Design a protein with these regions (language model features):
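Signal that preferentially marks extracellular ectodomain short beta-strand elements
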Residues: 115-120, 232-248
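Short, aromatic- and glycine-rich surface loops/edge beta-strands on solvent-exposed regions
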Residues: 128-131, 247-259
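Surface beta-strand/loop "capping" patches
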Residues: 170-200, 283-288, 582-590
Length: 591
């Protein structure tokens, strides 16, 4: 493992020229108190969690314990302005000191944050950074996904602390903190709103759109009541290139403030796409997902986003790109990002490659009564999948406390705001199989207030309240019978055929949904499932497929890839042929 991992710019949708990556070897200690440790336990390779092999530590942070980090650093070159310290994600709660001064903190293990550390910097240099972290894992109500201190089956080892890139940048006194970019496919426009750091600061904007390096639109903005600037740019018809899996065209966008001397202005670089999601009846009156006004078969995989050496954190950017490219080459156009939020670069690569993403809200809440939430409901799914998620069930579903419900509302908003800049995200999934679920109808309303340009899968699997755009089925055990409904039908989990491939690290206890004994048997069962069970349901309204899953994960050996991503388990040619057959059948059906 390299000593300076993941050096790439971590935020492609809001880029500046100033960039100083702080990944690498830091000192660490795990103690029982929040105070600075008297001594350090050794080195940790950031941004890998201490639980991972890649970190060089291999220790689990227990609830109540403190994980401390320390390193020295040099601020980005230049003078004046402000220096910002960025964290891609820290799980779960942290406090940050620079040169002994508390500069801020953060709560929430999946979302980026930045701290202005300018006033704490040492004029003579020799700056030092301390980070103290706590992670309650399963003892809290926070989003945690599939992390557990007792991993088995479909739940995986917990990870904690810094797990995404840490970096510095120098910005002007009044800088752009975020962009809200709203493309309008029908009007062929893009509206750009910049939020700036100082109340009453410069709000006038300049923006330019380029297509293939050619400037196609530019405009000025004006002050608005809240002192944030906005511009709307029109895309000429001859440069109208809709985004789709077959043609994932991205427009380049540059935005700058215009007031003050040149060194006082801020300039950022971004991108966007023109595309439109909707639901509409096909030629036979059956509801379908539509991209840019045309019915589309969403054919994809469940993606947990775990890696054997780094858990949540990939070994390098190239490994991420290779995996996504291979998925696309196999004929898939969809990934359901399951119970995890990825680093921004992952979505950037999906934007560029044309892979559609259905994004889960990361599940949290109190302990789940799995005997009820998962096992009983699954066995009796035909009877229970539409069970109301009303207050009497909140205790069983892990949302009995007001604090847990408030935490979910904050997490939902943070997720949408963090990812809505990515064209690849086509659907929000507020809840999965009842884990931490409550008031799904209210969650759909909250999502649509934040973003009304995407689909919403209200409740993936069961505890379906009848809202959102998707009738979302999970089916591993029953005969598949689909019928047309008022919402579009998606088979959002199925398959999961297990096969521990020889020559790869064996699981402690193999987990999956049926087991093959060889590559040939796995391939044959995959083909039979897709062509004899799934394909006939397309004409009855089935419009999205999410096979479980991309790769093996810990004890789960039901992936198409091995855990280390070095091999595809079924015959790749057969997978491509099956996906081509599904696509051809769908196109014929919706004609």
């Amino acid at each position: 493992m390299q000593h300076h991992p993941l050096p790439e710019y971590p935020r492609p949708a809001l880029r500046r020229d100033s960039y100083e990556n702080l990944n690498g070897l830091w000192q660490y200690a795990i103690t029982g108190s929040a105070g600075l440790p008297a001594k350090w336990d050794g080195d940790i390779l950031v941004p890998y969690s201490p639980e991972t092999k890649a970190s060089g530590v291999g220790r689990t942070l227990q609830p109540g314990a403190w994980l401390h980090y320390h390193r020295s650093f040099v601020p980005p070159a230049g003078t004046g302005g402000r220096v910002l310290l960025h964290f891609g994600a820290v799980d779960y709660a942290c406090a940050v000191q620079v040169n002994g001064h508390l500069v801020g903190g953060h709560r929430g293990g999946y979302w980026p944050f930045a701290l202005d550390i300018t006033d704490a910097l040492n004029p003579a240099g020799h700056d030092r950074l301390w980070v103290a972290v706590q992670d309650p894992t399963g003892t809290g109500v926070q989003a945690r996904g599939k992390q557990t201190l007792r991993p088995s089956g479909m739940f995986y080892p917990a990870q904690s602390g810094i797990w995404q890139t840490v970096w510095l940048e120098r910005v002007p006194e009044n800088y752009i903190t975020e962009l809200t970019v709203t493309p309008d496919y029908d009007a062929r426009t893009v509206t750009v709103k910049a939020h700036t750091s100082l109340p009453g600061g410069a709000a006038n904007l300049w923006a330019v759109v380029r297509a293939g390096g050619v400037t196609i639109a530019e405009d000025w903005g004006s002050d608005v009541a809240d002192r944030d600037g906005a511009v709307t740019l029109h895309i000429p018809e001859e440069h109208f290139f809709p985004w789709s899996p077959d043609s994932p065209f991205l427009y380049d966008l540059t935005v700058g403030t215009t007031q003050g001397e040149e060194e006082q202005r801020d300039t950022v670089h971004s991108y966007f796409a023109l595309r439109k999601w909707s639901c509409a009846p096909d030629a036979h009156g059956i509801m379908r997902f539509c991209l840019n006004g045309k019915p589309i078969l969403l054919n994809g995989l469940l993606d947990q986003g775990y890696w054997p050496e780094g858990l949540y954190t990939p070994p390098n950017d190239g490994a991420v790109v290779r995996e996504l490219q291979t998925i696309k080459e196999l004929g898939f156009n969809l990934l359901r990002k399951h119970a995890k939020i990825e680093p921004q670069r992952w979505y950037y690569h999906c934007d560029k490659l044309g892979l559609i993403v259905w994004q889960d809200m990361v599940n949290g809440g109190g302990p789940y009564k799995l005997w009820f939430v998962t096992y009983l409901t699954n066995v009796f799914q035909p009877l229970l999948r539409r069970l109301p998620d009303a207050r009497p069930l909140w205790g069983l579903l892990g949302r009995e406390t007001e604090a847990g419900r408030e935490e979910y509302a904050r997490e939902l908003e943070a997720t949408v705001k963090a990812l809505q800049c990515h064209p690849c995200v086509g659907c929000w999934v507020p809840f999965n199989e009842g884990w931490g679920q409550f008031d799904a109808a209210g969650a759909v309303e909250a999502v649509r207030r934040l973003d009304d340009t995407r689909l919403v899968d209200e409740a993936s699997g069961w505890y379906d309240q009848g809202g959102g755009d998707v009738d979302s089925l999970h089916n591993y055990f029953y005969p598949l019978r689909v019928r047309p409904r008022s919402r579009v039908v998606a088979l959002s989990e199925y398959g999961g055929i297990a096969w521990p491939m020889p020559g790869h690290e064996p699981p402690r206890r193999a987990y999956g949904y049926g087991t093959a004994k060889s590559r040939a048997e796995l391939t044959a069962r995959w083909k039979k499932l897709q062509l004899e069970t799934v394909l006939p349901q397309l004409k009855k309204g089935l419009s999205a497929l999410v096979y479980t899953q991309v790769s093996d994960v810990e004890d789960e050996v039901n992936g198409l890839f091995t855990y280390d991503r070095t091999a595809i388990k079924p015959d790749p040619a057969a997978v491509r042929a099956v996906n081509q057959a599904l696509e051809a059948a769908f196109e014929k059906i919706v004609e």
